[in-house]
Amino acid sequence: MCLFDQGKAVLVRTVGWPDLFVVGNIVTHIILWRVVKWRDPNGIGTKLFDVLQLGGNTLHITPTIVVGVFETCGINLINCGLFPPLGFCFWMCRRNSHCTLLSYLYEKTFTFVCVFGLVNGTYILVQLIPRVKKSSLLIYVCGRLTNDRK
C-alpha cells in the first residue's frame, strides 16, 4: 500500500460491534445478512453518516484470528472439507467456557486450530495465526449456503 492510499482508510459502522464475548450473535447476523437481507439491507454499504472516524496508519496490518462457521441450525452448508484435529480443543472447551477459550486463544502467539460449539447448535472453527501486535477477528462462512426451507 502506498502512502497516498494510507489516508483513504475509513472505519464503517457495524450492527453488532466485534467483541470476543458476543461472537455467536455476530455469526448469526452475518448468516442472516447473506441469506435474507435481514432488517437493515442498506447498512452494508458505507454512507456519509456511517463513517465513525478516519483509519489510522494502514501500513500496520497484522495477522488475524479466523473464525469460520461450518454448521448451524436451519441452514445447510455444503462443499466444506475442513476438519481439524480435535483432541486438545475439546478438552479446553470442557474445562473453560467458550468466551474464556476465545479470549485465551486471542492472547496467545501460536497457530492453533479448534472446533467448539456455541448456542443453538452453531459450530465454530477457530484458527489462531501468530501475530505481531494486535489481531483482528474475521468471521466468514465456509461452504455454500443452501436454502431448502419451505
Curated annotation (Swiss-Prot):
The chain crosses the membrane at residues 15-35, 51-71, 73-93, 110-130. Keywords: Membrane, Transmembrane, Transmembrane helix. The keyword Signal does not apply. GO terms for cellular component: membrane. It is a multi-pass membrane protein. The keyword Transcription does not apply. Its main location: membrane. Partially overlaps IMA3. This is Putative uncharacterized membrane protein YIL171W-A. It comes from Saccharomyces cerevisiae (strain ATCC 204508 / S288c) (Baker's yeast).
